[in-house]
Amino acid sequence: VLDIYEQKLGQTRVLDIYEQK
């Protein structure tokens, strides 16, 4: 569960940075 949660957070962060840029 932690793995999936971390993966989801990482993906969201990447998308956030991509959108910001």
Swiss-Prot record:
Q: Name one GO molecular function term.
A: glutathione transferase activity
Its top-level enzyme class, in one word, is: transferase
Its domain of life reads Eukaryota
Transferase as a keyword of this entry, yes or no, is yes
Catalytic activity entry: RX + glutathione = an S-substituted glutathione + a halide anion + H(+)
What UniProt keywords apply to this chain's record, in alphabetical order?
Transferase
Tell whether Transferase is among the UniProt keywords.
Answer: yes
Q: What is its EC number?
A: 2.5.1.18
What exactly does this protein do? Conjugation of reduced glutathione to a wide number of exogenous and endogenous hydrophobic electrophiles. In plants, may have a detoxification role against certain herbicides.
Family the entry assigns: Belongs to the GST superfamily. Phi family.
Q: Specify the protein name.
A: Glutathione S-transferase 1
Please give the organism: Populus euphratica
